[in-house]
């Protein structure tokens, strides 16, 4: 059997490096689930990966610096002959997009949240030398109706547009800790002058209780004994379903 055929059958390797908050941790595990389902081999050490995906944070200056340092460090691994590409995802990538691409030649691609549903396809294109159009930032608050109660319907109708790009997908745990985050919602409707999160994370949207409970059971089956709830604004949970007591009801299931 030729070495070419062997290489074609060998799984491609990817490392996910996560910076920032627990929300990014859940995003990374959902990306890992998508990649594993498509046959990618997940490795812990970026030096062992053909492609390093850096899940960046863009909230405060120190977090931005950490993200930039991580991208530069990942780029330096190309000298080892294993790492072929460095990809930025996450909040800083979403928030700055084209600006980050202009300033960071160390990255081979900067992907948006909208690319998450096709993450395997995107990484395959990049690793094969193809080019991905650089993400152009937009105000994600405009992607859903202003009235929260209209969002549950619009979300279901717009699944093809992947407004909530991760939705319900199998997570793949990236550690064996007995404690794990559980995402209950995305985005925020607050307009705090010091916070840009609604601009790049979008308007508030709750996950359906059935989805949350299903994922909680899955985490328990995988050795998790303690969960902590994650969202940009937990106190708003359920308002887009017209029920601010939805948390109380869910916990009584």
Regions found by a protein language model. Name each.
Residues 1-237:
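Proteins enriched for Cys/Gly/acidic motifs involved in redox and nucleic-acid/cofactor modification
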Residues 244-253:
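Alpha-helix-loop-beta-strand connector modules within alpha/beta enzyme cores
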């Amino acid at each position: 059997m030729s070495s070419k055929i062997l290489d074609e059958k060998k799984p491609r390797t990817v490392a996910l490096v996560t910076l920032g908050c627990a929300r990014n941790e859940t995003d990374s595990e959902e990306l890992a689930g998508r990649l594993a389902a498509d046959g990618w081999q997940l490795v812990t050490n970026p030096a062992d990966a053909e492609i390093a995906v850096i899940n960046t944070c863009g909230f405060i200056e120190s977090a931005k610096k950490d993200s930039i340092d991580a991208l530069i460090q990942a780029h330096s691994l190309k000298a080892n002959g294993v790492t072929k590409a460095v990809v930025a995802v996450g909040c800083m990538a979403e928030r700055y997009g084209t600006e980050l691409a202009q300033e960071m030649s160390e990255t081979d691609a900067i992907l948006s949240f909208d690319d998450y549903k096709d993450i395997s396809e995107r990484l395959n294109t990049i690793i094969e030398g193809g080019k991905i159009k650089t993400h152009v930032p937009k105000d994600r608050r405009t992607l859903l109706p202003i009235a929260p109660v209209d969002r549950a319907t619009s979300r279901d109708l717009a699944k093809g547009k992947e407004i909530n790009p991760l939705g319900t997908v199998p997570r793949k745990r990236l550690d064996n800790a007995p404690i794990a985050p559980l995402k209950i919602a995305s985005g925020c409707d607050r307009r705090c002058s010091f916070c840009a999160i609604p601009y790049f994370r979008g308007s508030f949207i709750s996950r359906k209780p059935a989805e949350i409970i299903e994922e909680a059971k899955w985490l328990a089956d995988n050795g998790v004994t303690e969960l902590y709830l994650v969202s940009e604004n937990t106190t708003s949970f359920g308002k887009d379903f017209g029920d601010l007591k939805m948390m109380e009801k869910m916990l009584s299931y």
